[in-house]
């Protein structure tokens, strides 16, 4: 069973089976949700399977692999990096590097286009840039300050705030993220309705006494990225 709702005033949690349990202390790890509606056209394109995110492991992970395998040699794979903070800071750069490695071996005419909404690589920048230069030059192209604002799943087109639209063959679009639904619905995601603010000495919510929030749903502190070793 699992929790479907939290009442921080009554100090109860509701389960999927309909039962309600009281708590004295609640430790909550609600994870993240993807804000598909923040990019025009993405929700529909994702629902149809035309544009995958594969940021939550599951069917989309397998689906993205199949799309890459089916892509003709000479095609372009477009991956974006959302504005920080987001789950697993090095993740998009790792994924781009892995796909570039696959292309180098099996589709050498293909290209990885990595579009970053941030001004620079957000994690391990020197390491990634060094590998891209030494191992994937001509295969992986990195462009900073490229915030995706819209997509067209049918034409495989990506749109931006200022730059001209770009077309690709496989689009892997990652929207902005926020704390999981439980945190939002219960009011615990109190920072811009996105992240949970906590006391970093105890991880107790600043708006819900006796509720301790851990993991990616917490607003990041300096030197505390949204990554596994911190969660």
Residue locations for each model-derived region?
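FAD-binding core/adjacent interface of flavoenzyme oxidoreductases
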Residues: 1-94, 101-105, 172
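A Rossmann-like FAD-binding core segment of flavoenzymes
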Residues: 1-6, 10-13, 21, 100-194
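Residues forming the flavin
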Residues: 21, 78-80, 87-88, 95, ...
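FAD-site-proximal beta/loop scaffold in flavoenzymes
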Residues: 43-71, 166-231
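Amphipathic alpha-helical segments in well-structured domains
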Residues: 61, 92-96, 129, 228-231
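Residues at the starts of beta-strands that form the adenosine-phosphate
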Residues: 76, 109-113, 210
